[in-house]
Amino acid sequence: MQKKDVCEYITKWVSVTISTLVTIGVLVFPLSSEAYPIFAQQNYESPREATGRIVCANCHLAKKPVEIEVPQAVLPDTVFEAVVKIPYDKQINQVLANGKPGGLNVGAVLILPEGFQLAPPERIPPELKEKIGNLYFQPYRPEKSNILVVGPVPGKTYSEMVFPILAPDPSVNKQAYFLKYPIYLGGNRGRGQIYPDGSKSNNTVYNSPVTGTITSITKNKKGASTVTIITTDNREVVELIPAGPTLLISEGDTVKADQPLTNNPNVGGFGQADAEIVLQDPLRIQGLLVFFASVVLAQIFLVLKKKQFEKVQLAEMNF
């Protein structure tokens, strides 16, 4: 009985210690909404919802365009490239987690059809490796090799990314078929506005929670602001604003509920795109070539036969 109590005590002590360390880690090293692929992997079983919406849009609220280019058709067991473009103005800077300006990072999630996967290094030709650069791709889940994520990586270098993809061979993979398949892309530039727990990052606008008068605004050494608002019923409401957004209000100003207290510093955004690719059957191509060849030969024989008939007619007329 005493041994059981000791085990329970040790278990509780370990649990409390781990919880304390995690709490301290969050306070000392605040979350960076720059690590968007990790957030999606940790919180969602699949990156694409039943509605077709990619879950990255839950944290990255602004919409921006993305592009994807793939071949119209590929042969089985061949390596092809999927080109992902995440365009943005390279001259602009974003607000970093510490409130200072910095360059934008980019990231992407590529949802391939079942059976398609990242090409192994030994199958990637040298010219394709040169296009890929130092990008590191990883599967969304160990069991989901058809879903690839990359980033965050520097946007100035990788606003255009090349994914090396290996097409499946239906003769080996019985889950693959010679069909037309959709490919889905989610791409982002810049940091998010909301963390997975629902809290705001410093890369978004902060609004007044109540209607009232601003009585004081204080800033700490790190640039964060504490805004005190007295409501019409004489309640004191304190709004904490992290370093990054620019304050639009001053002491003595009257504000309404949901009125912006800061600007919106976000310059990035998330976008979705899709494409289609055909897994082509080589026998079908061979059959098509044979058909075209037979049509050409038939036309040639028809012309020759016609000329021969004309010669016979001409000979009969001369006779």
Curated annotation (Swiss-Prot):
Keyword Nucleotide-binding: no
Residues that coordinate or bind heme: Y36, C56, C59, H60
Domain of life where this protein originates: Eukaryota
Any single Gene Ontology cellular-component annotation: chloroplast thylakoid membrane
Keywords: Chloroplast, Electron transport, Heme, Iron, Membrane, Metal-binding, Photosynthesis, Plastid, Signal, Thylakoid, Transmembrane, Transmembrane helix, Transport
GO biological process, alphabetically ordered: photosynthesis
Membrane-topology descriptor: Single-pass membrane protein
Protein name, UniProt field: Cytochrome f
